[in-house]
């Protein structure tokens, strides 16, 4: 699991979701309006649905944790959506990290 630091809060999410979110933020153009994305996460050990608003200038940090990566309901779908969004805005030449 990775810790997502956003707007003063820490959320735990799967490694794949965290990586896909960072990949998406990385390719966002500066002139694109804010976009809300939904990801599965853990907060205080309980599953939650997190909604974050992203722009190219959004300060987002991701750190590794000692918590074993586990399945969260909707994590595969969230990764697919984030990857599609990244491909859409990045255009030709986008290669997601795997």
Language-model segment annotations:
Residues 1-14:
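Short, extreme N-terminal segment that most often corresponds to the first beta-strand
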Residues 4-6, 45, 75:
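Preference for short coil/turn "hinge" residues that link or interrupt alpha-helices
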Residues 6, 60, 82-83:
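Generic hydrophobic, helix-prone segments enriched in Leu/Val/Ile
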Residues 12, 29-64:
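Short, structured protein-protein interaction patches enriched in aromatics and acidic/basic residues
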Residues 16-27:
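Charged, amphipathic alpha-helical segments
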Residues 26-29, 87:
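Signal for well-folded cores of large energy- and translation-related assemblies
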Residues 67-98:
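Mixed-charge, glycine-accented linear interaction segment located at domain edges/termini
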